[in-house]
UniProtKB/Swiss-Prot annotation:
Function description: Catalyzes the specific phosphorylation of 1,6-anhydro-N-acetylmuramic acid (anhMurNAc) with the simultaneous cleavage of the 1,6-anhydro ring, generating MurNAc-6-P. Is required for the utilization of anhMurNAc either imported from the medium or derived from its own cell wall murein, and thus plays a role in cell wall recycling.
Pathway given in the UniProt record: Amino-sugar metabolism; 1,6-anhydro-N-acetylmuramate degradation; Cell wall biogenesis; peptidoglycan recycling
Organism: Edwardsiella ictaluri (strain 93-146)
GO molecular function: ATP binding; kinase activity; phosphotransferase activity, alcohol group as acceptor
Enzyme class: transferase
GO biological process: 1,6-anhydro-N-acetyl-beta-muramic acid catabolic process; amino sugar metabolic process; peptidoglycan turnover
Alphabetized SUPFAM superfamilies for the sequence: Actin-like ATPase domain
Binding-site list for ATP: 12-19
Protein name (Swiss-Prot/TrEMBL): Anhydro-N-acetylmuramic acid kinase
């Protein structure tokens, strides 16, 4: 087994920063040892949003963004190493998810595309890098997502409790950790994505701090019902989604019948959409004793309170309470997936993604033996 220190990199659909974590990993333990959040420049966010919402682009723009993200990821890793007083030689490998710009798991030509040149990550850090995790699962008929339920199961499953782990990033995804049953997981729908997009559109703020804006509005029941009628919510698992569906264009179509609506009421309704779509899926799966929450949405007190109200008898709590950082969960997961790949172990769960078999995930970008230090 390739035990030792790993670094995980995650930049999700919320675009709230590049999360970089340091972890010591072996067969039984993932020990969180440090983290750093690297800012994403405004012009890079703009380019990502343009591509991921289906705007016309060019191959040159795709290539330039791929290179830029690779450079940003490497810079984030080097910042973490400096802060932890470590060198590249102290790290076994980096697990780099990349930035999803399009995820199309269904139809006649399913594919997923994450940008962030891992050749540059390996070259600029001097550390072997594992990336492009999702496409191998899709090659075996899977959705390529979610991949984190395997990690949730390894760290948070309990033999005597019905537990579910909920990640609320831009998209929300749920892992079902039920005793005696195969692990299942899927995307429930929008997490922070629509709330963040709406407050940016109306207030030029990147997110609704403490849900203060949403709390100034009221839920529009008819609008909520209309939103929940989107076919995605009724689809059975395995399923996954992203910004290519739940984006501002989707929201604007929903609002066509509501001219002059108060913007705060829309925000309140979007918060309720996130909470309700999650709670509905928890109940459809038979409920649970504990719903353990991670991702940026754990800091939204309105969504957390509404989930607790919609799920009486269920403890709704951050994963921190059970020993795993809610903010660093996904980056830790990709460090762990890199460990799995280098150790010759499968990283996907066919019961989650729908793939027809377990498989190693990702491509390996090795250290260059001809580098005398890394100065590019």
């Amino acid at each position: 087994m390739k035990t030792g220190r790993y670094i995980g990199i995650m930049s999700g659909t919320s675009l709230d920063g590049i999360d970089v974590v340091l972890a010591a990993i072996d067969e039984t333990l993932v020990a969180h040892q440090g983290h750093y959040v690297h800012p994403i420049p405004h012009e890079v966010k703009t380019a990502i949003l343009a591509m991921s919402q289906g705007q016309e682009t060019t191959l040159a723009a795709v290539g330039e963004l791929d290179r830029t993200l690779g450079t940003l990821y490497a810079g984030a890793v080097n910042q973490l190493l400096q802060r932890q007083r470590l060198t590249a030689q102290d790290i076994v490998a980096i697990g780099c998810h990349g930035q999803t710009v399009w995820h199309q798991p269904d139809g006649s030509a399913p594919f997923t595309l994450q940008l962030g040149d891992n050749n540059r990550v390996a070259a600029l850090t001097g550390i072997a890098t594992v990336g492009d995790f999702r496409r191998r699962d899709m090659a075996y008929g899977g959705q390529g997502a979610p991949l984190v339920p395997a990690f949730h199961h390894a760290l948070l499953a309990h033999p005597g409790e019905r537990r579910m782990v909920l990640n609320i990033g831009g998209i929300a995804n749920l892992s079902l950790l039920l005793p005696g049953a195969a692990v299942r997981g899927f995307d429930t729908g929008p997490g922070n994505m629509l709330m963040d997009a709406w407050i940016w559109r109306r207030c030029r703020r990147p997110y609704d701090a403490n849900a203060a804006w949403a709390c100034g509005g009221r839920v529009l029941s008819a609008l909520l019902t209309q939103m929940l009628a989107d076919p995605y919510f009724a689809r059975p698992a395995p399923k996954s989604t992203g910004r290519e569906l739940f984006n501002l264009a989707w929201l604007e179509r929903q609002l066509q019948r509501w001219p002059g609506v108060d913007a705060r009421d829309v925000q309140a309704t979007l918060a309720e959409l996130t909470a309700r779509s999650i709670a509905d899926q928890v109940q459809l799966a038979g409920g649970c004793e504990r719903l353990l929450v991670c991702g940026g949405g754990v800091h939204n007190p309105l969504v957390m309170a509404r989930m607790a109200a919609l799920l009486p008898g269920t403890e709704v709590a951050p994963t921190d309470k059970y020993g795993v950082s809610a903010d660093d969960m996904e980056a830790l997961a990709f460090a762990w997936l890199a460990y799995r790949t280098l150790s010759g172990l499968p990283g996907n769960l066919p019961s989650v993604t729908g793939a027809d078999r377990p498989t190693l995930l990702g491509a390996i970008y090795p250290v260059n033996p001809y580098d005398a230090g890394v100065a590019l």
